[in-house]
């Protein structure tokens, strides 16, 4: 592999609540060190602009189009990322010259894998100018060009983490990493480092939309609202009978593929409780499409902080002989893992290593990806 690089990863997920930042040192294969991490929340007004951006993006037919508010939103989003990077570096006493590359995810506003169309707002050239650091961005597009779904991309990082955990005997295999973000996704690491990955269903997005619409708050903190309700079986079955869960061919999801319940379908508490169950049950049902039954689930993402989701996931997984662990039980950071992954992927991109595989996105062959925006004053190169 190449020399070890210091990379910063930037992630703004489907929950649209803020920017996660993390540092990773890697040669593109092994993870040499996981450094500091932090989160920077968006203010409510900017979150509303992002929601409007989702609506404006519905009319996009080509990746480069920016109808409605999207051009201004992309610039403002990028500048907020640049400010977050500067704050993060200052808070952690890191000089920009000591960072080799930034992996910039941007904000997904449209994802239509059936049309080979994915749009992440984020101006890599502007971010490189504002931070003085090389930026790798737009990492999903090349996968789609080669027949992939454009998601998930994190499995390459999960595989690197699993190698490290297996060496010290901390987990039983096969292991499945579960990321419960707005959408939940699974990464299966089997014998011989076989990697299979796909989206598993709604994560937090339906719960977030439900409680925001009916309680005026952005999310159900810790699952407190859900803990006061009961599972409405008819409503849960309506979601779990969706063809997505039974289809043999797995596909990536957009946050609009599942809609929250109608106002009259449930009380606030019962709705939150039922949707938490759907998240957990969707994970276990989707895992039945894997090559072998998981022995260990490692859970990361914001959903692991919802006690009701985790309780249901423990019960459902244990009924099938699997153990469920939060990332922190293995000295991993469940909040920053996606940002860490984007740092890792940026280094792999710089070394032209694969980001995606046939078993993760359905791409025709292992492919690299990402576009490089060099910091001002030089053409970026890796030596």
Curated annotation (Swiss-Prot):
Keywords: ATP-binding, Carbohydrate metabolism, Kinase, Nucleotide-binding, Transferase. GO terms for biological process: 1,6-anhydro-N-acetyl-beta-muramic acid catabolic process; amino sugar metabolic process; peptidoglycan turnover. It catalyses: 1,6-anhydro-N-acetyl-beta-muramate + ATP + H2O = N-acetyl-D-muramate 6-phosphate + ADP + H(+). One of its GO terms (molecular function) is ATP binding. Pathway: Amino-sugar metabolism; 1,6-anhydro-N-acetylmuramate degradation; Cell wall biogenesis; peptidoglycan recycling. ATP binds at residues 13-20. The keyword Nuclease does not apply. The keyword Glycoprotein does not apply. Its EC number is 2.7.1.170. PANTHER family: ANHYDRO-N-ACETYLMURAMIC ACID KINASE (PTHR30605:SF0). Catalyzes the specific phosphorylation of 1,6-anhydro-N-acetylmuramic acid (anhMurNAc) with the simultaneous cleavage of the 1,6-anhydro ring, generating MurNAc-6-P. Is required for the utilization of anhMurNAc either imported from the medium or derived from its own cell wall murein, and thus plays a role in cell wall recycling. Belongs to the anhydro-N-acetylmuramic acid kinase family. This is Anhydro-N-acetylmuramic acid kinase. It comes from Rhizobium meliloti (strain 1021).
């Amino acid at each position: 592999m190449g020399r070890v690089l210091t990379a910063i990863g930037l992630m703004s997920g489907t929950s649209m609540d803020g920017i996660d930042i993390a540092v990773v040192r890697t040669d593109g294969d092994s993870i040499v060190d996981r450094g500091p991490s932090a989160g920077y929340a968006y203010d409510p007004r900017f979150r509303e602009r992002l929601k409007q951006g989702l609506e404006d993006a519905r009319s996009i037919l080509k990746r480069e189009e920016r109808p409605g508010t999207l051009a201004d939103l992309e610039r403002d989003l990028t500048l907020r990322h640049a400010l977050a990077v500067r704050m993060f570096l200052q808070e952690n006493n890191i000089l920009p010259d000591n960072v080799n590359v930034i992996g910039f995810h941007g904000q997904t506003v449209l994802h239509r894998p059936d049309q080979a169309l994915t749009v992440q707002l984020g101006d890599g050239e502007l971010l490189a100018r504002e931070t003085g650091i090389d930026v790798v961005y737009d990492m999903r597009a090349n996968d789609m060009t080669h027949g992939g779904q454009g998601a998930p991309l994190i499995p390459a990082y999960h595989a690197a983490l699993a190698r490290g955990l297996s060496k010290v005997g901390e987990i039983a295999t096969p292991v499945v990493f579960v990321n419960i973000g707005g959408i939940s996704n699974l990464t299966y690491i089997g014998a011989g480092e076989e990697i299979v990955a796909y989206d598993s269903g709604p994560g937090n997005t339906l719960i977030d939309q439900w409680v925001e619409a009916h309680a005026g708050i952005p999310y159900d903190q810790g699952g407190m609202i859900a803990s006061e309700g009961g599972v409405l079986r008819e409503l849960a079955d309506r979601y779990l009978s969706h063809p997505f869960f039974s289809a043999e061919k797995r596909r990536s999801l957009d946050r609009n593929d599942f809609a929250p319940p109608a106002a009259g379908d449930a009380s606030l508490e019962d709705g939150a409780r039922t949707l938490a169950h759907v998240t957990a049950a969707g994970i276990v049902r989707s895992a039945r499409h894997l090559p072998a039954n998981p022995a260990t689930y490692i859970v990361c993402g914001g959903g692991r902080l919802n006690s009701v989701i985790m309780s249901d996931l423990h019960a459902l997984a244990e009924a099938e002989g699997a153990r469920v662990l939060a990332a922190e039980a293995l000295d991993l950071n469940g909040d920053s893992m996606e940002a860490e992954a984007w740092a890792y992927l940026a280094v792999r991109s710089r070394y032209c290593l694969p980001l995606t595989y046939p078993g993760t996105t359905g791409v025709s062959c292992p492919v690299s990806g990402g576009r490089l925006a060099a910091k001002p004053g030089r053409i970026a190169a890796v030596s």
